[in-house]
Swiss-Prot record:
Spectrin repeats lie at residues 272-378, 381-494, 500-602. The keyword Signal does not apply. Residues 1-153 form the CRAL-TRIO domain. The lineage of its organism: Eukaryota, Metazoa, Chordata, Craniata, Vertebrata. May act as the primary docking protein directing membrane turnover and assembly of the transient receptor potential channels trpc4 and trpc5. Binds phospholipids. Transmembrane segments: none annotated. The keyword Ubl conjugation does not apply. SUPFAM superfamilies: CRAL/TRIO domain, Spectrin repeat. It comes from Xenopus tropicalis (Western clawed frog). This is SEC14 domain and spectrin repeat-containing protein 1. Belongs to the SOLO family.
Length: 696
C-alpha cells in the first residue's frame, strides 16, 4: 500500500510511529484518540500501513502501543484495544492505555485487561500520562506524554512520500535498466551487423532518481537538534522506520545499473557514431570515385589560347568548389575518427583505421588530381601568355622592318639599329622563355596519363602536344624570318651610316680645302729675303700643295664611294649635286692660287739668285759690259715681281683674291725694292771706275 493512496487518512494522524523505542528496543506505536468520532476502518488502514514499514527484525522485537484515551471515551479505547488483537496480535508486546484522571477509576475498575491477556495476546496496562516514564524512557516519548522526543507528523509524512516515490521509481528504473542492459548484452553482436534502432529510454531520468535518493539518504542520516532543551534525539525517520539500508541498497543497485546503462549508451552511441561515420565515409568515397572522378576524367584539354585556358580554369574552379564541400566533410570525419582513435577502444581500432586510411587515400588522390590539373592549366595559361607576348613582339618587330626608314643622319641610324637589336634580343629571350614553358607543359602532359583511370588519353595528349609544338615551331620560324630581315636592315643601315660618313667627310674635305686656300691667301705671303729662304718657302709650298692634293683626292674618293653606296641603296646622294661642285670649285681656286704662288716664288728666287750673284761677285774689267746686262735683267725681274704683287688672283667665276693684306704686300715690295736699290748701287759703283779710266 502506498502512502499516496491513503494520504487523506494519514494526514488525520490516527496513529503514528514517533521513532521512539521501549526498553526492549521495540518501536512505540502511538494512537492519539480524539473526542471526535474515530473511524475504525481508517484506523485499521492506518495501522496496516504503519506496521508494514518496519523490517521483520524490528517487528520481532515487538511494539509498544500507546493508546491515548485522555480525550476519548472508554468504549472507543476498548474497541481500539480489541482491534489491535485482530490487526497485529503477534507484533504487539505491550499496550499502554493512557487514562484520563479520576474518570476510569470509578467507571471501569471492574474491567481488568490483564485478565484478557491470554485471549488478547499482549499485555494491556492503564496508566496516567505522567506515569508512562515508568515503562518508557522520557527521551523516547513525545512531548504530549512529557517526553523530549520531537515528532512532526507532516514532516514525517512528506519524507515518507518521498521515500515511497523514490522506492517506486528506483525499483521501476532498476527493472527498466536491467531489461535494457540485459537486452544489450544479448544483442550486442547483432547490433554490430545492423543499424542501431533500439532507442528505448527509461521512463524516468536516472540522474534525477539518484539525486532524489541521495537527498533522501542525507535526510535519513542527519541528526536533529531539539532547540527547547538542547538534547539530541533521533529523527523520526530512523533507519529502522524508513529502511535506510534499503535506500542505500537501492542507490547502490541504481548506480551499478546506471553505470552499466551509461556504458550501454556509450557503446550504442559509439556504434551509432561509427555507423554514421562509415555511412558518411562511403558517401564521400562514392562521390569522389564516382561523379568527382568523372568530372576530372572529362577534363583533359589545355586550350588553344589565353581565353580558352581561362575558360578551362573557370570550369576547373567550379569542379574544385564542388570537391571543397566534400573535402570539408572529410576534414570533419577525420577529426571524429581521430577522436575515436584517441578513446582507445581496441575492438574498433582496426575498423576505424581502415575507414580513415581508405578515406584519406581517396581524398588525397583526388586532391592531388585537382592540384595537378590546376597546375597544368596554369602552366598552359602561362605558355599561351608568353606565346601571345612573343607574337606581339614579333609583330612589332616585323612592322618596324616593313616600314622603310629614311634617317637624316648617322646618329638616327645608330639609334634605330640599337632599337632593332634590343627588340631582337627581347624576341630571343621571349622565345627561350616560350621553349621552357612549352617543355614544362609537355612534361606535365606526359605525366597526365597516370591520372587517366584506365581511359585512353593518347588522342587528347597528342592534340595537346601537337598544339604546343606547333606554336613553338611557328614562333621559331617567325623569329628566323625577322632575324633575316634584321640582317638585311642592319646591312642597309650600316651602308647608310657609311654613306652619311662619306658625305660628311667629303664636306669636311671641302672645308679643309677652303681652309687651306684661305691659309694660302692670308699667310703664305712672304717671298723670302734671299734665295735660300725663297727656296725653303718654295719647298714648303710644294708640301702644302701635296696636303691639299691629298685632301682633294680623299674628297673625290669619298664622293665616288657615295655614288656606289647610293647605287646599292637605290637612293640619291645628297652630295651628288652640291659637294662635288664645291670640291671641284675650291680645288680649282686652290690650284690657280697655288700656281700663282709658285710663279711668284720662282720669280723671287730668280731675282734673289741673280741679285746675290751680282752683289757677291767682283768681276774683271773685261766683263763689265756683260755685268751691266745682268744688272738690267735683275732690275727688270725685280720690277716684274713688284708688278706681280699688285696683281690679284682671278678665278674662273670672275672673283679676285689678293695674297695677304695691303700692308703685307707693301712689306714684301719694300724688301724687293731694297734689293733693287742695292743692285742699282752696285751698278753705279761699277760705272764710276769705268768713267775715270776714260777720262784719264
Amino acid at each position: 500500500m502506498d502512502a499516496t493512496v491513503i494520504l487523506p487518512i494519514l494526514k488525520k494522524k490516527l496513529a503514528f510511529l514517533s521513532g521512539g523505542k521501549d526498553r526492549r528496543s521495540g518501536l512505540i506505536l502511538t494512537i492519539p484518540l480524539c473526542s471526535d468520532q474515530t473511524s475504525m476502518d481508517e484506523l485499521s488502514v492506518t495501522l496496516d500501513y504503519l506496521l508494514s514499514i518496519p523490517s521483520d527484525k524490528c517487528k520481532a522485537r515487538g511494539f509498544t502501543v500507546i493508546v491515548d484515551g485522555r480525550k476519548s471515551q472508554w468504549n472507543v479505547v476498548k474497541t481500539v484495544v480489541l482491534m489491535l488483537q485482530n490487526v497485529v496480535p503477534a507484533e504487539v508486546s505491550l499496550v499502554c492505555v493512557v487514562k484520563p484522571d479520576e474518570f476510569w477509576d470509578k467507571k471501569v475498575t471492574h474491567f481488568c485487561f490483564w485478565k484478557e491477556k491470554d485471549r488478547l495476546g499482549f499485555e494491556v496496562i492503564l496508566v496516567s500520562g505522567n506515569k508512562l516514564t515508568r515503562y518508557i524512557e522520557p527521551n523516547q516519548l513525545t512531548e504530549e506524554f512529557g517526553g523530549s522526543l520531537t515528532y512532526d507528523h507532516m514532516d514525517w509524512l512528506n519524507k515518507r512520500l518521498v521515500f515511497e516515490k523514490f522506492t517506486k521509481e528506483s525499483t521501476s528504473l532498476l527493472d527498466e535498466l536491467a531489461v535494457i542492459n540485459n537486452g544489450s548484452d544479448k544483442g550486442s553482436q547483432n547490433e554490430k551487423e545492423r543499424s542501431v534502432d533500439f532507442n528505448y529510454l527509461p521512463s524516468v531520468d536516472p540522474e534525477t532518481v539518484l539525486q532524489t535518493g541521495h537527498e533522501l539518504l542525507s535526510e535519513l542520516q542527519q541528526r536533529r537538534f531539539n532547540g527547547s532543551d538542547g538534547g539530541v534525539s533521533w529523527s523520526p525517520m530512523d533507519d529502522e522506520l524508513l529502511a535506510q539500508p534499503q535506500v542505500m541498497k537501492l542507490l547502490d543497485s541504481l548506480r551499478e545499473q546506471y553505470t552499466r546503462y551509461q556504458e550501454v549508451c556509450r557503446q550504442r552511441s559509439k556504434r551509432t557514431q561509427l555507423d554514421e561515420i562509415q555511412q558518411k565515409v562511403m558517401q564521400v568515397v562514392n562521390w569522389l570515385e564516382g561523379p568527382g572522378s568523372e568530372q576530372l576524367r572529362t577534363q583533359w584539354g589545355i586550350g588553344d589560347s589565353i581565353r580558352a585556358s581561362q575558360a578551362l580554369q573557370q570550369k576547373h574552379e567550379e569542379i574544385e568548389s564542388q570537391h571543397s564541400e566534400w573535402f570539408a566533410v572529410y576534414v570533419e570525419l577525420n577529426q571524429q575518427i581521430a577522436a575515436l582513435l584517441n578513446a582507445g577502444d581496441e575492438e574498433d581500432l582496426v575498423e576505424l583505421k581502415t575507414l580513415q586510411q581508405r578515406l584519406s587515400d581517396v581524398c588525397y588522390r583526388q586532391a592531388s588530381q585537382l592540384e595537378f590539373r590546376q597546375n597544368l592549366l596554369q602552366t598552359a595559361l602561362d605558355f599561351h601568355s608568353v606565346a601571345q607576348d612573343l607574337s606581339q613582339q614579333l609583330d612589332g618587330l616585323l612592322g618596324m622592318l616593313c616600314v622603310d626608314v629614311a634617317p637624316t643622319d648617322g646618329a638616327a641610324i645608330q639609334q634605330t639599329l640599337k632599337l632593332l637589336e634590343e627588340k631582337l634580343k627581347s624576341v630571343d629571350t621571349g622565345l627561350q622563355g616560350l621553349r621552357e614553358k612549352g617543355q614544362g607543359l609537355l612534361d606535365q602532359i606526359t605525366n597526365q596519363a597516370s591520372w587517366a583511370y584506365g581511359k585512353d588519353v593518347s588522342t587528347e595528349n597528342k592534340d595537346n602536344v601537337d598544339h604546343i609544338q606547333g606554336i613553338m615551331e611557328d614562333m621559331q620560324l617567325r623569329k628566323q624570318r625577322c632575324e633575316d630581315m634584321v640582317d638585311v636592315r642592319r646591312l642597309k643601315m650600316l651602308q647608310m651610316v657609311q654613306l652619311f660618313k662619306c658625305e660628311e667627310d667629303a664636306a669636311q674635305a671641302v672645308d679643309w680645302l677652303n681652309e687651306l686656300l684661305d691659309a694660302l691667301l692670308k699667310t703664305h705671303i712672304r717671298l723670302g729675303d734671299d734665295s735660300q729662304e725663297t727656296k725653303i718657302l718654295l719647298e714648303k709650298h710644294r708640301k702644302f700643295v701635296d696636303v691639299a692634293q691629298s685632301t682633294y683626292d680623299y674628297g673625290r674618293q669619298l664622293l665616288q664611294a657615295t655614288v656606289v653606296l647610293c647605287q646599292s641603296l637605290r637612293c640619291t646622294s645628297r652630295s651628288s649635286g652640291d659637294t662635288l661642285p664645291k670640291l671641284n670649285r675650291v680645288w680649282k681656286q686652290f690650284t690657280i692660287t697655288s700656281e700663282e704662288r709658285v710663279h711668284r716664288l720662282e720669280m723671287a728666287l730668280a731675282f734673289h739668285s741673280n741679285a746675290e750673284k751680282i752683289l757677291q761677285e767682283c768681276p774683271d774689267l773685261g766683263e763689265t759690259v756683260m755685268d751691266f746686262e745682268q744688272f738690267d735683267e735683275v732690275e727688270a725681274v725685280g720690277k716684274s715681281v713688284l708688278d706681280r704683287l699688285t696683281v690679284p688672283v682671278i678665278y674662273p667665276d670672275g672673283t679676285e683674291q689678293y695674297f695677304g693684306t695691303p700692308s703685307d704686300m707693301a712689306s714684301t715690295a719694300e724688301h724687293i725694292r731694297e734689293r733693287i736699290k742695292m743692285v742699282c748701287l752696285k751698278k753705279q759703283q761699277l760705272l764710276e771706275p769705268d768713267e775715270s779710266i776714260r777720262e784719264s
